[in-house]
């Protein structure tokens, strides 16, 4: 659970990756964010909220030398599959996938949680379109 201190890394320090690094409390949910990786030279060697950003080229070596339980994937979708294969081949147990590509793990022991912002937006659209009585009842249930 939430008190285990699972080791995690974040891959892709673009807008979404930076937002997660700076605003999401991984520790609260039982994850110790150990490192982040990116290809942009201006980011490499810097740190966000105490998490150092490493060159993406060093990821295989990092994975070989460190136990990583989970990875947060924020890379461009063109790199999603190859990055997932790299992670799973190095024994990463779980991937929190923000790439907008529906990923499945080549390793049956790896869990992939695909996050699709469009699903959340569709849910909102559905809720907005319900008539007022249904909306009021749903709001009462959801806001308890």
Please place each PLM-identified region on the residue numbering:
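Short, solvent-exposed amphipathic alpha-helical segments in soluble enzyme
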Residues: 24-28, 87-90
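Phosphate-bearing ligand-interacting subdomains
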Residues: 50-142
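HTH-adjacent hinge/linker in prokaryotic transcriptional regulators
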Residues: 1-7
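Conserved N-terminal Rossmann-fold NAD(P)-binding element of oxidoreductases
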Residues: 11-12
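Hydrophobic/small residue at the entry helix of a nucleotide-binding pocket
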Residues: 16
């Amino acid at each position: 659970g939430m008190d285990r201190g699972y080791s995690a890394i974040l891959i892709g320090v673009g807008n979404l990756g930076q937002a997660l690094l700076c605003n999401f409390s991984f520790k609260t949910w039982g994850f110790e964010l150990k490192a982040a990786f990116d290809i942009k030279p201006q980011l490499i060697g810097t740190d966000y909220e105490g998490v150092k950003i490493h060159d993406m080229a060093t990821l295989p070596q990092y994975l070989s030398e460190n136990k990583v339980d989970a990875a947060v994937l924020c890379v461009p979708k063109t790199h999603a599959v190859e990055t997932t294969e790299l992670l799973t081949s190095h024994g990463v147990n779980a991937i929190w996938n923000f790439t907008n590509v529906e990923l499945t793990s080549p390793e049956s022991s790896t869990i992939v949680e695909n996050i699709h912002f469009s699903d959340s937006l569709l849910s909102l659209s559905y809720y907005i379109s319900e008539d007022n009585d249904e909306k009021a009842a749903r709001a009462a249930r959801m806001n308890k």
